[in-house]
């Protein structure tokens, strides 16, 4: 069911599967951008400093990501790089003190796919590091949005991983519309989800945990989908307004 597994892509991404150990970031048909344009974006890196997921910084020591990103790691195995357009160099590399994923996260249905990371060292805002506000309501269908992450500029045929941050423009598809007959997911789209869609553009293969931003607010967290940039299958995100109260509560506990 997770969208970010290369072998799924080779078999047209059947909507079933197990969680991968590493999730390498991909944006389909995106363009180069800079961290100054998206200073809330961060890459999560494992002990070998390999990129495995994205995230969004929301305060001096808190990063929001996807629950499914965190299943194979302990806090000591994760580092967060902030303030760099290049995923594996520059900026500030910060250790993780603790993290928690949503108690209601279900890897089969992908509901509540959200986690909160507490950094070991607080970071200050700058031109390259900015905290992003959590949206308190889901924008209506058709609202322009942007997804960012690190990865190939095309689907399957690109073998190299660009070091430069990528962005792709999409349109919001709210939960009701995404579950309608206009698209092909049906009842798989649940209340804690929001979708985004643009022809031949998408997040894919491990931009998991990264931001979906509209109106300068964090609207969604990259979660899952059927393949990447497939006609009739929007990208599916954890709906931030639906889990905002959990994020705020957990922020006080970490």
Curated annotation (Swiss-Prot):
Entry GO MF terms: serine-type endopeptidase activity
Gene Ontology CC: extracellular region
Classification via InterPro entries: Peptidase_S1, Peptidase_S1_PA, Peptidase_S1_PA_chymotrypsin, Peptidase_S1A, Trypsin_dom, TRYPSIN_HIS, TRYPSIN_SER
Active site as annotated: 68 (charge relay system), 113 (charge relay system), 208 (charge relay system)
Role description: Involved in digestion of a protein meal.
First-listed, main subcellular location of the protein, grouped into a coarse class: secreted
Residue ranges of the propeptide: 17-26
Signal sequence region: 1-16
Entry EC no(s): 3.4.21.4
Phylogenetic lineage: Eukaryota, Metazoa, Ecdysozoa, Arthropoda, Hexapoda
Swiss-Prot/TrEMBL site (Required for specificity) positions: 202
Protein name in UniProt: Trypsin
